[in-house]
Amino acid sequence: MTVKSAIAKAAIAHRKFRRMLHNSRMFTYIDSTVRQRLTTQGSLFQIDREGARIDSAKARSGGATISMLGPIPLPLCDMHAEVEWYACVRNTELGKIEELADDLRAENHQQSFATLASFMAVNSVLVVGDPKTWRDPLVRVHSCCMTGDVFGSERCECGPQMKTALARIQDDEQGGLVIYMSGHEGRGIGLWAKAATYLLQDAGEDTYQANRSLGLPDDSRDFSDAAALLKYFVDGQPFRLLTNNPKKVDDLAALGLGDITRVKHVVGVTDNNRRYLTAKQDWGHKLDVEDLGKE
């Protein structure tokens, strides 16, 4: 077995394992009494795939639902507008996991909670303004990027895109929201496989060729959770989506969201990521020659 095929198999197995856990272990270790208190005060609630609130009993019975914690006031540096944070996780087979968490707590296996938490893909929603007053809000669905968003890497433009999206939404008269998709690292292949693709890119392949060399899709992101959250917060309103990727618009439309206006979002172009962005342009992203600083 070659190194590439071994990495590819490991990445696929990792994704399947995460998906299994994602579908079965999503909302774990909050103590039942605290959970009830949060539910009573309306800070813990569930929505279905159409963005409608549902009662907790229905959520516990299974199905494609999402549990949400919020709103949580979140002061952000460089932001004068008030921002409210919602933490969001899938909610299938919740009862079994809560029982497991209760058992771990009773047996004082505190270290096991970190293991459970490591498999939870907790997405976030950052809301600027009052959704009840929105008419055509500005929205960014942002895929997690540890290297760009956290480390400030210039191999991509993700960090500047995230920061600028918040600034643009803050300055927009309608306000809006950012949905941060924590399971989308490396366009859905995960951080480990993404690191391998970086090495392949340094050997001459572009970002999509590197994925294919590992036997992985060009883009394996799932936007179904983002669509449900948009249905909840935007509630049937038209909205503007900050993206250069028409496929993202198509994916959301296929999940039942209509009346989306794509808004160009070019920022953070440097010599370090121009080749990467050129590959995106070739793949279908709406980037002009001027956007990439080419003559």
PLM feature spans:
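Catalytic domains of riboflavin
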Residues: T2, I7-E295
